[in-house]
Structure formats: C-alpha cells, structure tokens
Curated annotation (Swiss-Prot):
Cysteine-cysteine disulfides: none
Single GO cellular component term: plasma membrane
Cofactor comment text: Binds 1 zinc ion per subunit.
TM region positions: 4-24, 33-53, 154-174, 195-215
Residue numbers annotated as active site: 140
Compartments where found: Cell inner membrane
Catalytic class of the enzyme: hydrolase
UniProt EC number: 3.4.24.-
A single GO BP: proteolysis
Needed cofactors: Zn(2+)
The name this protein goes by in its record: Protease HtpX
InterPro entries: HtpX_protease, Pept_M48_protease_HtpX, Peptidase_M48
Record-level Gene Ontology MF annotations: metalloendopeptidase activity; zinc ion binding
Length: 287
C-alpha cells in the first residue's frame, strides 16, 4: 500500500524539524532530560498529527470518492454491508469510499473508532465476487473495531522518540570523542554534527520500521480473525487466496499501508507490514 513513501517522508520531516529546533534552542546530550522531552514531543506529536489528519490525507492522496448517496446497486451494497458489519462490531458507521486503482486492495483509516474511513479500490470492487469483497470489508472494519489506528500511532510515537533520542545521544558521544582527540577541542562542528545525526536517524529509523512492521503483522492476523467472525472464515480464506493469485500491489501511501488488506511484497519479511498471504491463510485454517 502506498504507505511506505509517505511514512518515511513524514518521519524524515519530523526528524529534520526536531534537529533544527533543538539546535536553535541549544538542546544537546548534556541535558538528557531536555533531550528526552523534546524527543517525546516531536515523536508523539508527529505521530498524532498524522493520525488526526489521516482521513483527510487519505482522501487527497488516494482520490477517494466518499459514497454519500449510492449511485447504483454496487455502491448501495457496499454501504449496507459496511453498516451491518459496523453494527456487529459495535462501532459507529465508517465513511465508505472508492478510489480508482487497478490493484486489488482496500484500507481503513481515521483518528478513532467513531471517526473512520473504509475505502476499496475499483480494481478490487470489480475483480472480486461479493463474498470476497464482504470479507475484505470485514477485515477493514475489524481494524477499526480493534483500535489499530490508535495502537499503531502509539507504537510509532514510541519508536519516533527512540530514534530522535538515541541518534542525538550517539552523535553527542561521537562529538565528545572527536573533541577529546582534537587539540583545539572543537569537536564535530554544527554541520558535521547534524550530518552524523541525519545518518543515525536513517539507521535507527530502519530498526524502528522493523518494530512497527512487526506489530503491524500481528494486527493483520487479528483483523483476519475478526473478518472471519463477521463474514465467515471460508469467505476470508477465499479473499486472501484471490489476492494471492492477483498481481502484486503498488505502493500505497504510508499512512494507509498498515491497515490495508494486502501489503507489498518485500525481500525481507522483517520490513513487511503484512504477513505473507500464505501464512495468513494457514493461520485462519488452523483456527
């Protein structure tokens, strides 16, 4: 899903702003308490801002057309199915939208269980049968009902804080080491220090992405189980099998990727937001 690029860009912007602000205010590794506070403010602040604007961002980046008044039987069925599943799951009716894309995919987003959006691609809508689409919708409704949007935001906030804090602590250690071995004791200097911080942000960011991806994969299994309860296990297995036979998905904006039905394949499973479809099918059959 098109999440990866937007997530990286958003977090890199947060880290860059954090670096600039901390440099201006003179926050450094000698004031660990201040550094940690700033790291938490930027780490959680950026994550929650992304959550707050997630529906708006999804509509803009994906070109989602929200169904306010169904124009045909297909749209009417979509809205009625989501409404029924939302009632079963005990959540407020999400907005339902369609976005134009040939890929078989869908996603859920929004700041809370009572303020969410479920969107399906035109490719999925016309490339699957009703039972399979019903299961996909149930998967997305389960994401909303499980509170996955807030959960993943909290996890993202924690790892953002870790990246901001750890990168600057390590950069401070390197700066002190260079200073102690420099006759003039000048250390790295501002620009070299910021360059080191940027590189460390990238390295720690990769580790942080693995952590977020791990929790995202766990939430996918839970959403599959929820979909099996709402729509039926065989329908969910059929939907996953259909996705497995279809073409590989394109890149979905980062803010939607973890809560979609199908993730992009990766050479390293550690970086995948979704477990392989084969494993998801096996997990459902085991229950």
């Amino acid at each position: 899903m098109k999440r990866i690029f937007l997530l990286i860009a958003t977090n890199m912007a947060i880290l860059l702003v954090a670096s600039i602000v901390m440099s201006i205010l003179g926050v450094n590794t000698s004031t660990m308490g201040g550094l940690l506070v700033f790291a938490a403010i930027f780490g959680f602040g950026g994550a929650f801002i992304s959550l707050a604007i997630s529906k708006w961002m999804a509509k803009k980046t994906m070109g989602c057309e929200v169904i306010t008044t169904p124009r045909d039987n297909t749209e009417r069925w979509l809205v009625e199915t989501v409404a029924r599943q939302a009632e079963q799951a005990g959540i407020k009716m999400p907005e339902v939208a369609i976005y134009q894309s040939p890929e078989l995919n869908a996603f859920a987003t929004g700041p809370s269980k009572d303020n969410s959006l479920v969107a399906v691609s035109s490719g999925l809508l016309y490339g699957m049968n009703q039972d399979e689409i019903e299961a996909v919708l149930a998967h997305e409704v389960s994401h909303v009902a499980n509170g996955d949007m807030v959960t993943l935001t909290l996890i993202q906030g924690v790892v953002n804080t870790f990246v901001i804090f750890a990168a600057r602590v390590v950069a401070g250690i390197i700066d002190n080491f260079v200073s102690s071995n420099d006759e003039e004791g000048e250390g790295l200097g501002m620009f070299a220090y910021m360059a080191v911080v940027f590189v460390l942000d990238m390295l720690f960011g990769i580790l942080a992405s693995m952590i977020v991806a791990y929790f995202s994969r766990i939430r996918e299994y839970r959403a599959d189980e929820g979909a099996a309860k709402l729509a039926g296990k065989e329908k969910m297995i059929a939907a996953l099998d259909r996705l497995r036979q279809g073409p590989e998905t394109g890149a979905m904006p980062a803010s939607m990727s973890a809560l979609g039905i199908n993730g992009k394949k990766s050479m390293a499973e550690l970086m995948m937001s979704h477990p392989p479809l084969e494993k998801r099918i096996e997990a459902l059959r085991a229950h």
